[in-house]
């Protein structure tokens, strides 16, 4: 059963032009507006589910980061997700047997509400609250595990947030953050996404292809949200620099892993096309093609390219560390 620790403010899923303008000068306001806007469609946008596919994916990320001897001692009793979004990482890790119960936090009220709703639908023991990652509203030594997926690059002061993570962990507790963009990977992903958007936009203006384009009102709203994306995406990371930050925050047993090289080169163009095409237009065949192709390239990246490609060239970096006992 899921509960909230405190009343969650009302989300604002449709920011006005004036609010967007104000958010361009305030990164935390931008985080709230952007992620409130995305909250109700976030799972569809990123093909997130809470079935075996994503349960296995989340567990694979965890297992790739955490030492095998610690995996044999699972589950953790109480886990926190920082920047929970729709709850993808923690809810699927709980289902995978990593933790018994969880707390979800996000700066966006909309995301917290969706994450709690998802937890309720799964029958999981999850509570949640709106929270700033630079000032986590929990007591010292509260959690056995802290996790996050694609959150650190949104936080203005990453090292300050990691210090907060170490503070709320129990002695010997572990953190695992996955899905963070590397500096090199982010560069090629952004360029591929921009090129795909331009080509696809021009193609849907051709005779007979207008039905493959979302209504202009939706695209205009997407443009307002996209204007905030440059404000909310604050950092990219070199794996070695991220490790140094975690050490400076007081963590020990720090290590990083990277994932997705050619898989990211395919995944970003596919996601860009999905963002501009009306929902349901591409069909199951497209989804199956995208997932199967991405899985194949991910295997190649992990088992072949890793022997020759530098760690920092991969798109995603994951980091783990432990609070000293």
What does each model-identified segment do?
Residues 225-241:
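Acceptor-substrate binding/catalytic loop of class I
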Residues 80-82, 86-135:
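Class I SAM-dependent methyltransferase SAM/SAH-binding core
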Residues 251-262:
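Conserved S-adenosyl-L-methionine
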Residues 159-171:
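A short glycine-rich, Lys/Arg-flanked "PGG" loop and its adjoining helix->strand segment in the class I
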Residues 262-303:
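C-terminal helical/coil "lid" or tail adjacent to the Rossmann-like core of SAM-dependent
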Residues 5-74, 92, 174-215:
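Conserved class I S-adenosyl-L-methionine
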Residues 134-145:
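A short acidic, Gly/Pro-enriched loop at the edge of an enzyme's catalytic core
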């Amino acid at each position: 059963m899921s509960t909230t620790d405190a009343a969650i403010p009302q989300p604002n899923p449709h920011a006005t032009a004036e609010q967007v303008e104000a958010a361009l000068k305030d990164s935390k306001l931008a985080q709230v507006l952007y992620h409130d806007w995305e909250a109700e469609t976030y799972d569809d946008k990123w093909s997130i589910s809470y079935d075996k596919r994503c349960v296995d994916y989340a567990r694979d990320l965890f297992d790739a980061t955490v030492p095998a001897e610690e995996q044999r001692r699972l589950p953790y009793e109480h886990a926190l997700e920082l920047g929970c979004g729709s709850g993808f990482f923690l809810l699927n890790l709980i289902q995978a047997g990593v933790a018994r119960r969880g707390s979800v936090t996000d700066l966006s009220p909309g995301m917290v509400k969706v994450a709690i709703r998802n937890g309720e639908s799964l029958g999981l023991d999850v509570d949640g609250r709106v929270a700033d990652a630079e000032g986590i509203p929990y007591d010292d030594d509260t959690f056995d595990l802290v996790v996050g997926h694609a959150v650190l690059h949104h936080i203005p002061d990453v090292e300050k947030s990691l210090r907060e993570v170490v503070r709320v962990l129990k002695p010997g507790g572990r953190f695992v953050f996955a899905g963070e963009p590397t500096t090199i990977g982010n560069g090629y992903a952004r360029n591929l996404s921009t090129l795909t958007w331009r080509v696809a936009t021009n193609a849907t203006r051709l005779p007979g292809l207008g039905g493959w384009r979302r209504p202009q009102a939706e695209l205009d709203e997407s443009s307002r949200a996209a204007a905030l994306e440059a404000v909310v995406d604050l950092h990219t990371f070199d794996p070695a620099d991220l490790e140094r930050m975690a050490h400076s925050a007081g963590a020990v047993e720090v290590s990083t892993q990277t994932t997705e090289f050619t898989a990211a080169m395919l995944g970003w163009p596919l996601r860009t096309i999905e963002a501009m095409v009306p929902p349901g237009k591409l069909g199951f065949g497209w989804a199956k093609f995208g997932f199967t192709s991405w899985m194949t390239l991910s295997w190649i990246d992990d088992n072949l390219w890793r022997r020759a490609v530098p760690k920092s060239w991969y798109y995603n970096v994951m980091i783990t560390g432990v609070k000293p006992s």
